Amino acid sequence: MVKCSYEQKPFRREVMRTYGANVTPSPSMETEVGRKINAEFPGTTGSLGCAISEAVEAAAQNEGYRYVLGSVLNQVLLHQSVIGLETKAALDKYGIKPDMIIGCAGGGSNLGGLIAPFMGEKLRGEADYRIIAVEPASCPSLTRGKFAYDFCDTGMVCPLAKMYTLGSGFIPAPNHAGGLRYHGMSSTLSQLYHDGLMEAVSVPHTAVLEAA
């Protein structure tokens, strides 16, 4: 579990422990890549990229284990599209036609899932939604990143992906939305943004909490 979230959200880790999980804050001293990151960034609160690297190493070194990336990649967005399908079904039921779709963006799986059916209509010319990704100011991959091939994890063991990225070695400052602290953005969303089919803004987490 990313150390930032491990410390900020103790109830989440305790729920996992209740169901029998061993929960370790990342970066840890239990893996080679974790020790390397701790040495390079003393006192770091980690990132999703760090946790992915440690999980991949742990799976690779233990017989019978496999690691499946849970964000960013296309198959994850496809699975998450149930979010958008249910949203669209609910809106259709009540006769609501949105003109704007807004969602938070970290690695992109939730946003990609939300906008999937709406973006499909937009690409087919059936509707013209304004689609906006809202990312944390502490980790603004779309608004300040570079569109290039990069590793999906800090330890550089996962495959390369073409995406908007701040660099696989980027360690973001802590913020309240630990799940959004990822250095890159889904290749699919990156291409849509690059092609001008969606917008992006970066917002400080304090401003988001005040607005809510």
Task: Tell where the protein language model's regions lie, with residue ranges.
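Active-site nucleophile and cofactor-binding loops and adjacent substrate-binding regions
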Residues: 3-5, 102-107, 135, 202-205
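Active-site/ligand-binding loops adjacent to catalytic centers
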Residues: 31, 36-77, 83, 95, ...
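Repeat-solenoid scaffold signature
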Residues: 100-132
